[in-house]
Amino acid sequence: MAGRSDPIPDEAAEWLAEEGVAGAAPRKGFPAARAEHRVSQQPAFVLHSYPYRETSLIIDVFTRDHGRIALVAKGAKRPHSALRAVLQTFQPLSLSWSGRGEVKTLTRAEWVGGMLPLGGEGLLSGFYLNELLVKFVAREDGHPVLFSHYVETLNKLAHGEPVAFTLRAFERVLLRETGFAAQLDRCVDGEPVQPDGDYVYHPERGIRRALPSDPSSWPVLRGQTLLDMERDDYSRPATATQSRSLMRFLLHYHLHGTPLSTRQILIDLQKL
C-alpha cells in the first residue's frame, strides 16, 4: 500500500507533449480546463510505465470504470518506494488519483491479489493484450465489460488454457466493445448466418454473403465458423484457422497496417 497527495506537476504535461500524447500540453500559464477530479479505490491494471525524471514514473493503467488513465507515480523509482513493488503488470490493483487534464496524480495504490502470475507464452500473450488495449481503448472511456473480460483472459492464461483460443475470444470482445466489430451470427441486412454459407466481414459494415467481386484480401468464412466464434467455441479445426485469419484481417485494417510487435513475436513462435 502506498499513498501520495501531491498535485500534478507541470513537467508531467510537458513530458506527455514531448512524447506525442494527444491533448497534452504544459499547464503553466493556462487556466484549468476542468475541475479537480478525484477517484478512489478503482480496480485497475498497469498496462505500461514510462520513466519520468530521476525518481518517478508515468503509468498507463486500464481501469474498470474510467478506461485508460495516465498517472504520475511520484517517487516510484526510488529503491525503497512502496509503489515500486505494487505497480506491476498483470496484477489486480486498487488505485486512487486526483487532478485535472490528461495526466492525473496517483494518490494511493494497493495490491489486491488473488491472481496467479503469468509465465512463458502466457506472459508474452499478456503483453499482447496490453498492447491491444493501448491501441484500441481511448483515454477516460470506460469499458466495464472489456475490463471483466481482460481479468478473465489473464486468469485463463495463468491456468494454462489454450493460448490461441483464449486470445481469439479476447480480440472479439475488444473489437466489439470499442465499436470496431459487430455480432457474428447475423448479417448486416438482418439475415441470420447459415452454417453452410460462405461469408465475408466488410470491415466497415459487418457480415454479409461472399461475392465473386470481393477483394482477395478479405478472408472467406464459413457460416459455422462465425457461429462458433459468437459462442467462443474454437474447437473445430476450420474455426480455429478461419478465426485467426479474420482477426488478423480486422486488426490490420483498424490499425491502418501498423504492426503489433507482440503479435509478430507470437506469430514467429507459431502460437497465434
Curated annotation (Swiss-Prot):
GO terms for cellular component: bacterial nucleoid. Keywords: DNA damage, DNA recombination, DNA repair. SUPFAM superfamilies: ArfGap/RecO-like zinc finger, Nucleic acid-binding proteins. Transmembrane segments: none annotated. GO terms for biological process: DNA recombination; double-strand break repair. It comes from the Bacteria. PANTHER family: DNA REPAIR PROTEIN RECO (PTHR33991:SF1). NCBIfam families: reco. Involved in DNA repair and RecF pathway recombination. Belongs to the RecO family. This is DNA repair protein RecO. It comes from Ralstonia nicotianae (strain ATCC BAA-1114 / GMI1000).
